[in-house]
Amino acid sequence: MTSQPFDLITVGGGLGASALAIAMARQGARVLIIEKEEKFRDRVRGEYLSTWGVAEARALGIADLLLQDCAKECPWIEMGFGPRNVPETTAQGMSPITYSHPEMQEVLLAEAEKSGVQVRRGSIVQGIEPNASRPVVTTRNGKDERIGARLVIGCDGRGSAARKWAQFESHKNAQPFQFAGVLLTGVSGREDLTTFLFNPELGLVIATVPQTKRRWRAYLGYPVNGGLALQGTEKLKVFLAESAKVAPGVGESYADVECVGPLASFEAGENWVNHPYHDGVALIGDAAGTNDPTFGQGMPMTLRDARVLFDALRAHSDWDRAGHEYARQHDQYFQDMRKVCGWLRTLFQDPGPEAQAIRQRAMPKIAEDQTRVPDHLFGGPELPCDETVRARLLGEL
């Protein structure tokens, strides 16, 4: 069966898909979201949207909706240098926001439907046929269906099938770390402050992210060579014990917690596509590129992808040209953020002897001048990331 074509089809219905679909539908585009999940469930995902990501959400017209229905502002952060007021110390002047990831997804998908987007849940995409003039998506939901569009967007995450179907070449950079997370109640701490702390001598990093309904998402990054297997709620005591090693006071903050969601871990490696557009198919978010999750840049990057593609589609009547323009910009900001996160990983997380030598040189200088640490995690990829920035961070200047 062949259906009438849409302007835009998204494979996946998460953050990037819904944000882009809402923006396009408000401009009069005919948009279809195909989401295999009939209901989003709690998994270990990002739930802290840093300042530059909030700016992208505002540009796409969804920030106020999130704050109204599922999110809260979390303006303070502690990274070992004392509490920092993020909106007062970033160019955007906006507070980071936090939320439950599945609740955010449901809110945005409902808004997409209100905006005129056709949403199909429980449908399984079976393939994509790239074509610069009319790509086709094949789905199954009781029957096979071929659906054409001007543009197909793969928004189906780090294990993207769309990436494979459209024959994009993936590039991988494995990292010797795992990243685990769990949803907790009973954390002792300020509900307007996120904690993000490293212990590089042990290769450990923790984050505690307060969200709505007095819940906290707790994260732990740890070396793969330590023999830990943090999978399943029966491993909660191990998760908490390892987290307590990062810094004084962490164990006390977890003394009375209860687990209210799954405990899971995954690899902290990088995976990306160069130039994530060809022949009528674009990739955004984790489908286009997965950065090291330790640094929490996945959601801001997803919203940047959605906004840049949205702007390109509005600017060019030739959507093939628009797709290439999006992909060109994506490569630049994705690789800039990847580069900076690599520097931060070396200095703050790598327990190896070379990194230890760098810390001995760099940390005394940083203690005297914290502007040596580049602020891309909050300010975004427009900040400088040249050789001078690297050398100042690593104490070479």
Q: What is the predicted function of each stretch?
A:
Residues 134-145, 151-263:
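Conserved FAD-binding catalytic core of PHBH/FMO-like flavoproteins
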